[in-house]
Swiss-Prot record:
Annotated function: Specifically methylates the guanine in position 2445 (m2G2445) and the guanine in position 2069 (m7G2069) of 23S rRNA.
Entry keywords, A to Z: Cytoplasm, Methyltransferase, RNA-binding, rRNA processing, S-adenosyl-L-methionine, Transferase
Catalytic activity line of the entry: guanosine(2445) in 23S rRNA + S-adenosyl-L-methionine = N(2)-methylguanosine(2445) in 23S rRNA + S-adenosyl-L-homocysteine + H(+); guanosine(2069) in 23S rRNA + S-adenosyl-L-methionine = N(2)-methylguanosine(2069) in 23S rRNA + S-adenosyl-L-homocysteine + H(+)
SUPFAM superfamilies assigned to the protein according to its UniProt record, in alphabetical order: S-adenosyl-L-methionine-dependent methyltransferases (SSF53335)
Family the entry assigns: Belongs to the methyltransferase superfamily. RlmKL family.
GO cellular component terms given for this protein: cytoplasm
Organism: Stenotrophomonas maltophilia (strain K279a)
Enzyme Commission identifier(s): 2.1.1.173, 2.1.1.264
Domain THUMP: start-end pairs: 42-153
Alphabetized Pfam families for the sequence: Methyltrans_SAM, RlmL_1st, THUMP, UPF0020
The protein, known as: Ribosomal RNA large subunit methyltransferase K/L
CDD domains according to UniProt: AdoMet_MTases, THUMP_AdoMetMT
Length: 712
């Protein structure tokens, strides 16, 4: 019987070899799978033993299918009572390609309808639907007007081994992990007494899969347990029991002989804990040594030969950084130069960044992400000292030169004004369109962090060029500032967009303390688009701090309260900070406490600033108002700074004490101040030029600012 075994793209030839090793006489690689020929018992053996397959599809019919009615009629014509009992549950997976039936979910529903109607034709009850754990899973492949119906013998995706419990970020599917191990020739190296190493092990997928492979544990044993994978009426239960019994015998012998030659490390303690828990469930914890360590501190295992398998971060969500790949390549050359490596890199640029010489390179897909798998044997690169950094590309060198030029230009200004947080680069080279902000940590560690915000590239720029330039920019920044990858935050940001303070990027909850204008401040460089400190307002905050000693200060739309904190440190008699966000008010409270500025004189108010102004009757000597461009919070009326400016400024000016001053600023680039209307209640003059520091002179439209005083 001819049947189909599917797999991820890029694994087809490996799968064909695996099926041949399992005894299939005919196994021909095709797109995303293998066309196989054999008996049902052989197909069931694949369900139990294949480490690479996604599904094993046993055909039950094939027919012409020009349209939806033909699909329904063809399915209804089949004797479904010979495949499923009424009390069983059913699921249908559909994969369609054509111009008449284009929606897989619609096709799956029509198949379910046809099966149910045929069962009723036979005088039987309709089977129920269970999309997660059905008794029988039917598969449709519709291509070029021809429908192929199959039974999914495994009952679902075969990459699920049954041990995964504690998932870490972006886990690798087990069948792709098996492919990396096979490309690294791990079975051969293990048989020769070699070791296995993953220096960025995450939740342990590669190492656990390697341990199960070394112990000869069938992938289907834990996945299916004591039950058969399918209750299809054509399923050969006797053959399955025999296959299962053989697998259990081999598992017992293999686990007993498995030695602790597998090593995993990761800088994230949560990942290490997840890996240990997963290994325990899989029954291979005794064979794997997990340690928390940075890749730069990689220790050499005791085995002289072995395989390195690694899936370093490479998608935008995980902030791929070529410097991290360079550190990985250097560490491997130092620790295990004679080992073989199989590294799944995000693209050719990141593979190149490792500095390793790939003997072979394969195209693979991790889900929808196209990746480059490089195989190095041995890891050592003749004539290269891993301690020496790899030369920057021409583009990266251009960025590095501009960064050094800017740092030289800012040197005297930074020394004179004690500037430790500043913008070092703002799309100075148009093709490298990003902003690079520097944050120097205060206190004992004195680490330097980089906050890189990439502006959205025009749609006409090819994605490969965008990715290459991003990697070159990061490489240059890392080189110039000498910072490790964990101290670089990479984000993408569209030009000219107002608001957007609130989207979450990561969940590191890592704060560092920096200093500005004599105040200590907590910033979070990784979790949100903005950091808690708007660097462009530094001169304006300094200007206000110089005026507030012994005075009452009001901060509207206060965000994290930086201006309030600096006013308190400068000796303000009182500060009042108003914001709708409890998160930002807590941040403000923490910033005040960090500077020893507690007490009732520093008031935090959670409220809509517009509504609060209408009810407040206090008087203030200095008011700072920096509203968002737009706001549509569920807890307050919609806000538009252009539309609401008169109402806002009239209410704020009304709160000024005699001789008081209001500083109004916003970053809406198309903002137009209604000067004539404002002149009826306030003296107003623009002071933008005084509020732009040297580091923002290239982008003088980053914000605008005005000074307002009450008439009379």
């Amino acid at each position: 019987m001819k049947f189909f075994v599917s797999c991820a793209k890029g694994l087809e030839y490996l799968l064909a070899d695996e099926l041949s090793a399992l005894g299939l006489g005919k196994a021909t690689a095709t797109i995303a799978g293998v066309n196989a020929e054999g008996e049902l018992e052989q197909a069931l053996r694949i369900v139990m033993w294949s480490r690479l397959a996604s599904r094993v599809l046993w055909p039950i019919d094939e027919f012409e299918c020009p349209d939806e009615q033909a699909l329904y009629d063809g399915v209804r014509a089949l004797p479904w009572h010979e495949h499923i009992k009424p009390e069983m549950t059913l699921a249908v997976d559909a994969h369609v390609s054509g111009d008449k039936i284009t929606h897989a979910r619609f096709a799956a529903q029509r198949i379910k309808d046809a099966i149910v109607d045929r069962m009723r034709d036979e005088g039987l009850e309709r089977p129920s639907v269970n999309t997660d754990l059905p008794d029988v899973r039917v598969n449709l492949s519709l291509r070029k007007g021809r429908a192929s119906l199959s039974i999914d013998l495994g009952g679902g995706p075969l990459h699920r081994r049954g041990w995964r419990g504690a998932a870490h970020e972006a886990p690798l599917k087990e069948n792709l992990a098996a492919a990396l191990l096979l490309r690294a020739q791990w079975p051969r190296l293990h048989a020769a007494g070699g070791g296995l190493l993953d220096p960025m092990c995450g939740s342990g997928t590669l190492l656990i899969e390697g341990a199960l492979m070394a112990a000869d544990v069938a992938p289907g044993l834990m996945r299916h347990g004591s039950l058969p994978p399918s209750r299809w009426l054509g399923f050969d239960k006797s053959a399955w029991k025999t296959i299962q019994s053989e697998a259990r015998d081999r598992e017992a012998a293999g686990l007993a002989a498995l030695k602790p030659v597998i090593h995993g490390s990761d800088i994230d303690p949560t990942a290490i804990q997840a890996a240990r828990e997963n290994a325990e469930v899989a029954g291979v914890a005794h064979a794997i040594r997990f340690t928390r360590a940075d890749v730069a501190d990689l220790a050499a295992p005791e085995q002289e030969i072995g395989a390195v398998v690694c899936n370093p971060p490479y998608d935008e969500r995980l902030a791929a950084d070529p410097a991290l790949y360079r550190a990985l390549g250097n560490a491997l050359q130092k620790a295990v130069p004679q080992w073989r490596a199989s590294l799944l890199c995000g693209n050719d640029e990141l593979a190149f960044a490792t500095g390793l010489r790939a003997g072979k390179k394969y195209q693979m897909f991790n889900g929808a992400l196209e990746c480059a798998l490089i195989v190095c044997d041995p890891i050592a690169v003749p004539g290269r000292d891993p301690a020496q950094p790899r030369e920057l590309s021409e583009g990266a060198q251009m960025v590095a030169n501009r960064l050094r030029k800017n740092l030289k230009k800012f040197k005297s200004w930074r020394a004179r004004e004690d500037i430790t947080c500043f913008r070092a680069y703002d799309a100075d080279l148009p093709e490298y369109a990003a902003a690079i902000d520097v944050y120097e940590e205060d206190g004992g560690k004195r680490r330097t962090f980089l906050h890189v915000q990439e502006y959205a590239a025009p749609a006409a720029i090819p994605e490969n060029d965008v990715r290459r330039r991003r990697n070159e920019l990061l490489a240059a920044a890392r080189e110039v500032f000498g910072v490790p990858p964990e101290q670089v935050s990479m984000k993408s940001r569209e030009r000219g967009k107002g608001g957007s303070k609130y989207g979450r990027f990561e969940q590191r909850d890592e704060f560092i303390v920096v200093r500005e204008n004599n105040a200590l401040l907590q910033v979070n460089l990784f979790d949100y688009l903005d950091t808690g400190l708007f660097l462009d307002h530094r001169p304006l905050r300094r200007m206000m701090a110089e005026q507030v000693r012994g005075k009452r200060f009001l901060n509207l739309f206060c965000y994290t309260g930086v201006a309030s904190v600096q006013a308190a440190v400068a000796g303000a008699a009182s500060t009042t900070s108003v914001d709708l966000s409890a998160t930002y008010l807590q941040w403000c409270y923490d910033n005040l406490a960090l500077n020893g500025q507690g007490g009732n004189q520093h008031l935090l108010v959670q409220a809509d600033a517009m509504a609060w102004l209408e009810g407040d009757r206090g008087q203030y000597d200095v008011i700072f108002c920096d509203p968002p461009t737009f706001s549509n919070s569920a807890r307050a009326d919609d806000f538009d700074v252009q539309r609401e400016q008169l109402k806002l400024l009239r209410a704020a000016v009304a709160r000024l004490a005699p001789g008081g001053v209001l500083y109004f600023s916003n970053n809406f680039r198309r903002f137009k101040l209604e000067e004539n209307a404002i002149a009826e209640f306030a003296q107003c003059r623009e002071i933008t030029a005084r509020t732009i520091g040297p580091d923002f002179e290239r982008n003088a439209r980053i914000h605008r600012a005005w000074e307002l005083k009450r008439l009379g």
